[in-house]
Amino acid sequence: MTFVVLLTSAAIRATPGVMIVPLEKEFGWSRAVISVAISVSLLLYGLIGPFAAGLVNRYGPRRVMALSAFLIGLGTLSTVTMKSPWQFIALWGVLVGCGTGITAIVLGATVVQRWFHVHRGLALGMLSASSATGQLIFLPILAQIVVTSGWRWAVVAVAAVALVISPIVFLVMRDRPQDKGLAPLGLPPGEPVPAPAVGGNPVVAALSALKMASRSREFWILAGSFFICGASTNGLVGTHLIPACMDHGIPEVQAAGLLAMMGIFDLIGTTGSGWLSDRFDNRLLLMTYYGLRGLSLLYLPYGFVSEGHGLSIFAVFYGLDWIATVPPTAALARQAFGAEKSPLVFGWIIAAHQVGAALAASSAGLLRTVEGNYDHAFLVAGFLCLFSAIGVLFAGKRPPAPVLSPQTG
């Protein structure tokens, strides 16, 4: 059920990519103005995450996810009546941003912490892959609806999904395995089930976690790398790739299909990343992911003008590590701050991710308005990813090598 809610939230976060050009044409709004609303939504998605972790500890995932789906559906549906940019900012930016923020990746980390004793990296990788799956399922359909029936019907479709899911989550989901007479997956027989976190004031809990984490070098390295991660994914490619494709004469449905193709490879890459994060040095994994992403973004401006399968090559290599950074980053946070505190700290790392996404979404929209293309935005993001590939090597310590007992004859 968590996967379904995160999938729906991810699909709605990706929807503006197919709305930018139709909104430009209908209302005459500039791409920079439209990007402001998207930036606000991305920013709130991140900033609410740490407090959402506190809400989950106090009220449980079931109530929190049901509320999130309702807010997402309400905010999305309300945009069909908007007439001016401030309404788009208030509805999509604020209301939808708050709703998706409650279902930030930190929610998946909290659920994994409760339901899994082993294979946590793999489980988080599968939940993180919901973003890829959301694009895979929804974006080509939404693009086709926009082309044939207009952007309003596309919005109604995703709003309906969210509003239907909300009561189902409330009625069906359970907060922890004990509620169903189960133990966390892989918990050894006879070992006591970890006590759930004590519910308290979510604001105090989130701010206390930030105060504690901010004294750590690992926090700033992980938050800084995730800032660049957000800028180079949700903020830039997730928001502006479809409009950039249309600038080069690629039809909207075909451009959405490119994102869906990336979603297929990201589903593979992120799930595989979760498996790898349980077994290998997570810093080396992050170095590989950011390096591959940086090279892909540096190639993208040339992919637009190359003949043949230039964009397909980009989609494969960029897609493989789009959200693959989540499991190793969460694992490093858990290693640095412990199982109990890491979900709240990871919430602040997600906040940094979305601050980067918001800045990239607005900056790329402004660059497109001023320069007429996105080339510099893609190139800057590529170099930042290469910088991050080096920086993550300084996070944490290498896991100690296993000590082998001498064999006796």
Regions found by a protein language model. Give the residues of each.
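Hydrophobic core of transmembrane alpha-helices in multi-pass small-molecule transporters
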Residues: G75, Q87-T103, F227, G310-A324
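Intracellular juxtamembrane helix-capping segments at the cytosolic ends
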Residues: L23, I102-F116, A324-F337
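C-terminal ends and interior cores of transmembrane alpha-helices
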Residues: F70-K83, L292-V305
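Helix-loop-helix hairpin linking two adjacent transmembrane segments in secondary transporters
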Residues: L127-D179
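Extracytoplasmic gate region of multi-pass secondary transporters
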Residues: P16-I20, K211-T271, A360
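Cytoplasmic helix-loop-helix junction between adjacent transmembrane helices
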Residues: W92-A129
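Extracytoplasmic
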Residues: M1-R31, I48-A52, L139, L236-I242
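Helix-to-loop junctions at the C-terminal end of transmembrane segments
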Residues: I48-P61, T270-D281, R368-T369
